[in-house]
């Protein structure tokens, strides 16, 4: 039995879809009954919370391989550590941990939290696979599409730094392989980058071509970006963590590497940014055009 935690999240939903295609038995974990009701028909669901070990013990009973992912919140280390503890208690044989690019060498922001969980997992002696993905193509829709629709522009303190964005569906395909065939991926840590690296200005050009109108990237000072995010109601810890992560990309230049790791694992070419934008171009449609 395979356990998919975070099944209502962007990555978890994609992992569910991939594992479902395989025909392997699996269970999808949701934190609330409302989320569980959104599961695809026929999917075996269970309600549990990483903050409640008793609920986790019941949810993980009989599970052989588990995908662990938690929302990027300050309690991440504690919550995912609970998941590792329960996996040990109930006899889970293999864990696939969703970490982040930068966990190996960045002492700030989300990557540093993930590294603490990685270290605990490795020390536990559980068989495991760790995935460290770069930023997602889907984040362009989640974070940049609103200003693109309203102003034909998006803003960040990124300068000319390059990012090799990865499609969540490619990440999910790798995770599913590790869940379905754990022996082939045990003890491995995969840093997963997209197939091409682009600056935000180049990404704006690609969005422009996809939607058929000019879209600009506007490089702004970090403090201006901080103020904008705070004005939007984002909590200060989240703003600081996001800007620290952005510095990993923009100042340290750590987000633009392109490697063969992802295509080798997939056994095919990864989804390109052009392909992604062609599929999701309606998400960037101008409000003036009636979006």
Where are these regions (language model features)?
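Oxidoreductase cofactor-interface core, primarily capturing Rossmann-like NAD(P)-dependent enzymes
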Residues: 1-37, 41, 51-63, 72-81, ...
């Amino acid at each position: 039995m395979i356990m998919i935690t975070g099944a209502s999240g962007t990555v978890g939903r994609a992992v569910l879809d991939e594992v479902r295609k395989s025909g392997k038995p699996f269970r999808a974990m949701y934190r609330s009954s409302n989320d569980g009701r959104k599961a695809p028909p026929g999917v075996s669901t269970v309600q549990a919370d990483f903050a409640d070990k008793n609920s986790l013990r019941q949810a993980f009973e009989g599970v052989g391989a588990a995908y662990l992912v938690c929302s990027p919140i300050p309690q991440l280390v504690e919550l995912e550590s609970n998941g590792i503890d329960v996996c040990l208690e109930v006899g889970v044989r293999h864990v696939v941990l969703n970490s982040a690019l930068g966990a190996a060498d960045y002492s700030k922001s989300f990557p540093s939290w993930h590294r603490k969980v990685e270290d605990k997992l490795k020390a536990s002696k559980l068989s495991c696979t760790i995935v460290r993905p770069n930023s997602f193509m889907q984040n362009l829709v989640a974070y940049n599409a609103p200003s693109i629709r309203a102003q034909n522009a998006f803003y960040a303190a990124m300068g000319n730094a390059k990012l090799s964005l990865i499609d969540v569906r490619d990440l999910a395909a790798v995770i599913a392989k590790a869940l379905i065939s754990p022996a082939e991926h045990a003890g491995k840590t995969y840093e997963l980058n997209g197939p091409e690296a682009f600056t935000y200005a180049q990404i704006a050009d690609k969005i422009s071509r996809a939607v058929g109108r000019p879209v600009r990237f506007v490089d702004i000072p970090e403090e201006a970006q901080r103020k904008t995010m705070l004005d939007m109601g984002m909590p200060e810890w989240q703003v600081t963590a996001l800007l620290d992560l952005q510095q990993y990309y923009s100042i340290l230049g750590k987000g633009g590497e392109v490697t063969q790791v992802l295509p080798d694992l997939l056994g095919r070419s990864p989804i390109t940014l052009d392909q992604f934008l062609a599929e999701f171009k309606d998400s960037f449609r101008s409000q003036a055009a009636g979006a």
